[in-house]
Amino acid sequence: MSRTEVTSRPGPAGSPVLWSDLLGRRIRQDGMDTLGVSTQTLAEQHLAKGEWEIAGDLAEYFLDEMTRINNALFTWLEVILAFPGSGVSVDGVAEPRQVIAAMRSFGPGDGDLVAVALACDAQDLDAASARIETMRVRMAAVHDQLVWWIQHLLADIAERHSEEAVRDVVIRTYEELWRDRYAAWPQMTPVERLQISVEGMRGHLSGPRHRGDVGIIEEDDRFRMVLDPCGSCGVLRRGDPDSGRPGCDPAGTRTAHDWSWNRVGVGWYAVHSAIVMEWLPQQEGRPPMRPLDGCDTSGPCNWFIHKDPSAAPAGAP
C-alpha cells in the first residue's frame, strides 16, 4: 500500500490520525498528554484494548511517519550526490536520483505491515505487536545508515572543499525538501506547528527506546519539545539506546559560524537544524522558525515552538 493512500483515506472512528486541510493529509492530532508518545506504543495500547481497527490504522501511520523521514533523507542524499564538490557526483542530477530511486522504492517495512493487518483481522495481539516491532527495527536500520552516510559525505565535502560548502549543500536541500514541508507553517496554529514538528521526530525514532518518544512541555509563551536523544544526530553521537550500537564523535565545525550556533564541533549532519530553523529565516528577515538548545551534545536536545512566532528571539531559544 502506498504511503499516500494511508494518509489520504479516512481512518476508523476513534483514530487520532485526523485530516488536516493545511497539509492535505491525515496527521496525529491527539492531546498534549499523548502526542509525544510513540505511535508504536499507541498502537500497542489499542491492541491491548481489542480496538483492532484503530491499532491497524496507527500501525499504517507509524510506517508512514518513518517512511516520510527516510524519504527526506533520500532527497538530501540526491542533493549531496549531485553537488559538484561532493567527490562522488556525476554529470547532471538525473543519475543521482536514479541511484537513490532504487533504494527509496525498496520498502523494508511493507511486508510487516501486511502481517500486522492480517494479525489484527485474526485478533492476534502477540503476532500484531511482534510484527510492528519488527517493522520498526527494519526501518530504523535503514534510517540510521542514511544518517551515517549523510554525516560522512558532508564531512568529506568540508574536508575537501570548505565548511561553507556544507552550508551551501544544506541551502540547496532546503529548496528541494524543507521549503515545501514547511510551506504552510505561517498559516498554522501553534498546536498545528507542534503536531507536524512532533510527527517528524517520532518518525526519526527519537527517545530512550529509539521508537519515537518525544517529551512535550507547554510553557506560557511556547511549547518545548525534549528529544533524549534525538533519533538522528543524537543517536549518531550518543549511540543507539535500543540495539546498544555505540555512538561516535562525528566530525563537525572547526570554526564558529553564525549558521552553526557560533559553536565549534557541531556535527555535519546536525548543522542543518541551525541553518534551516534559525539562520535562513533570519537571513530572509523573519524570526527563527523553531529555535533549538543543546542540539548535538551529550544531553537532551530542546526545540522551542513559540505561540507568537514573532516573539522568538534571534540567536537564542
Question: What does each model-found stretch correspond to?
Answer:
Residues 2-271, 276-283, 287-300, 308-317:
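N-terminal accessory segment detector
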